[in-house]
């Protein structure tokens, strides 16, 4: 099951301005050649194509891959960590890893392996949950650490990151962090004003309040 897949289908694009999807799309930009790793049904590829990007996807779920082929220039089917990637060095402007690295068996090794695919001015753009979020810290204080079907402690997450360990992992894999943003969702409240206020509070201490990190990194 990919990061964007649920038992009932595939997670739709969240276009809220302070949400992870909108921030990812903003970091990718327009008119880029993008490798979308773990592309799911193409929910991120679709708006990128509408912005003039050429998107190549990798997806191991057959049903999702078929949906992604409707919008991607090409979709490779398989486990990205295991497959031979048939691309020349410096083939892409952007390597897109939306909610991917926490699912990988060896994130650092994989990120290092794909780094040569970036053009010199290219970017790795990714999101991943913040395991040091205040709710998890509070749970530890009261002796509670429960895995769930979704969220930061999703049962399918193999690696969890704090802000510091994420930066360290990227640097060891051959990247330099250019921008590190975050999301602070407000469950059950969808107004732009409330979300903007939550984001402003998160700015006071992102390592505590961030639910998810949104990163742009350049080849070092």
Task: Identify the meaning behind each predicted range.
Residues 126-148:
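Conserved class I S-adenosyl-L-methionine
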Residues 105-109, 136:
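Short N-terminal helix/helix-N-cap motif within the alpha/beta-hydrolase-1
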Residues 1-90, 94-96, 108-111, 126-128, ...:
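Conserved N-terminal segment of class I S-adenosyl-L-methionine
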Residues 98-100:
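Short catalytic micro-motifs in class I SAM-dependent methyltransferases
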């Amino acid at each position: 099951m990919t990061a964007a897949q649920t038992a009932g289908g595939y997670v739709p694009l969240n276009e809220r301005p302070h949400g992870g999807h909108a921030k990812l799309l903003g970091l990718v930009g327009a008119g880029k050649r993008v490798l979308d790793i773990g592309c799911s049904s193409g929910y991120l590829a679709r708006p990128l194509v509408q912005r003039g990007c050429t998107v190549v996807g990798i997806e191991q779920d057959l049903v999702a891959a078929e949906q992604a082929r409707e919008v991607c220039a090409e979709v490779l089917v398989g486990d990205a960590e295991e497959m031979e990637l048939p691309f020349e060095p410096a083939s892409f402007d952007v390597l897109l890893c939306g909610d991917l690295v926490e699912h990988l068996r060896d994130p650092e090794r994989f990120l290092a392996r794909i780094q040569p695919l970036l053009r010199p001015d290219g970017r790795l753009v990714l999101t991943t949950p913040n395991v040091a979020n205040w709710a998890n810290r509070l749970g530890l204080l009261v002796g509670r650490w429960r895995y769930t079907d979704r969220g930061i402690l999703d049962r399918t997450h193999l690696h969890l990151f704090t802000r510091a360990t994420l930066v360290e992992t990227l640097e060891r894999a051959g990247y330099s962090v250019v921008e590190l943003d975050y999301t602070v969702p407000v469950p059950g409240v969808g107004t732009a004003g409330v979300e903007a206020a939550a984001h402003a509070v998160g700015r006071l201490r992102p390592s505590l309040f961030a639910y998810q990190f949104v990163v742009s990194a350049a080849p070092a």
